[in-house]
Amino acid sequence: MIFEQIVLDFSGLVEAARDNSVLEAIFLSLYTGFLATLISFILGVPAAYILARKDFIGKRIVESILDIPVVVPHTVAGIALLTIFGANGLIGAPLDSIVQFRDALPGIVVAMLFVSAPYLTNSAREGFQNIDPRMENAARSLGAPLWKAFLFITFPLASRHLLIGSIMCWARAISEFGAVIMLAYYPMVGPTLIYERFTSMGLSESRPIAVLLILVTLTIFVILRLISSGWRRYDRD
């Protein structure tokens, strides 16, 4: 019985790997997760630097707001995003003629971005906080502008935290389900397709897709972790 189940699972996995709709959904998960991570990096790194280096009124409130996506239920996050980015939403309505978020790729990216950005921002902030600001000040006293001191001193020293934060951000983005289906059920990403197959066809049809998604993401995750570990050894040397 056990051997028969293994054979059935393997054959189902091979069949899933040949299914274009499955491959498209998994690729879309990886692609939109990458876009969400890229946007998180572009917006989150400057925000993390400001939070690590500057004191201002309301700083703790800003930090708390940035952490809201980590603790709020993701269906609630999806409803909030739908209210803002839907066709009649605060942002979705004015931009409806330019870009649509409801059941569209931008909506998937927005949902992933919302739930994953705090992981990168918090990791980057920790990295910047661990760097002695006197190193930047020394570079600036020698005539280096702020952007140059950041690019050639602060950024390399915080690179490991930035890489780890990016990995966690990407992993969190591609695993998101609740917020994504509320804002953009279509086009289907991997988790949405698994849910669709499970509710319509049962466990036997959804399990191979889940296993395939795990294998693909785990492989990429291990590679990124190995790069991070190698980076750590390089820094120590």
Say what each PLM segment does.
Residues 139:
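The alpha-helix within a helix-turn-helix
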Residues 1-9, 18-129, 153, 157-178, ...:
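Membrane-water interface segments at the C-terminal ends of transmembrane alpha-helices
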Residues 142-143, 156:
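Glycine/proline-centered hinge or cleavage motifs at structural transition points of membrane proteins
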Residues 125-136, 146:
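Membrane-helix/interface signature in polytopic inner-membrane proteins
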Residues 188-189:
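Extracytoplasmic catalytic/substrate-binding loops of multi-pass membrane glycan-assembly enzymes
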Residues 57, 145-146:
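Short coil/turn motifs that cap or connect alpha-helices
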